[in-house]
Amino acid sequence: MEDKNILVEGFNQLSQQALELSQHAQALALQASHAVLPAAAATEGASEFWWLMTVFVLACFIGFYVVWSVTPALHSPLMGVTNAISSVIVVGALIATGPEAFSASKVLGFFAILLASVNIFGGFIVTQRMLAMFKKKQK
């Protein structure tokens, strides 16, 4: 009977040590997860804003080189195309400014409407002046 009590007491001590070890392992796992979260957030990748900003900057550079590489004879058709693109931008900007809630998209949509309108009307004025150069002068 004494051997049985010693054996039971040994099992109780072993189970107590196993419980303490599991609690310690759980605390270490929690601590490790808290240490990893900031690193995981930092390596998550660029936000959507930076992707869109990169596309915008690349579009500006490509547009600059396309416009300045065009021969003078093709500037009139190029202006017509940019006016058409600006009208599409105005439609998209009107959709962006549509929601009632005040947000960044509403502000950016307003500026898009403003800049595209300046581009459209300026293009019409320049086109009108260019066409006036080809009219016969009245005597």
Swiss-Prot record:
Its main location: membrane. It is a multi-pass membrane protein. It is an enzyme of class 7 (translocase). One of its GO terms (biological process) is NADPH regeneration. The keyword Acetylation does not apply. It catalyses: NAD(+) + NADPH + H(+)(in) = NADH + NADP(+) + H(+)(out). Its EC number is 7.1.1.1. It is found in: Cell inner membrane. GO terms for molecular function: NADP binding; proton-translocating NAD(P)+ transhydrogenase activity. It comes from the Bacteria. It holds the Pfam family PNTB_4TM. The keyword Isomerase does not apply. The transhydrogenation between NADH and NADP is coupled to respiration and ATP hydrolysis and functions as a proton pump across the membrane. Complex of an alpha and a beta chain; in Rhodospirillum, the alpha chain seems to be made of two subunits. This is NAD(P) transhydrogenase subunit alpha part 2. It comes from Rhodospirillum rubrum. The lineage of its organism: Bacteria, Pseudomonadati, Pseudomonadota, Alphaproteobacteria, Rhodospirillales.
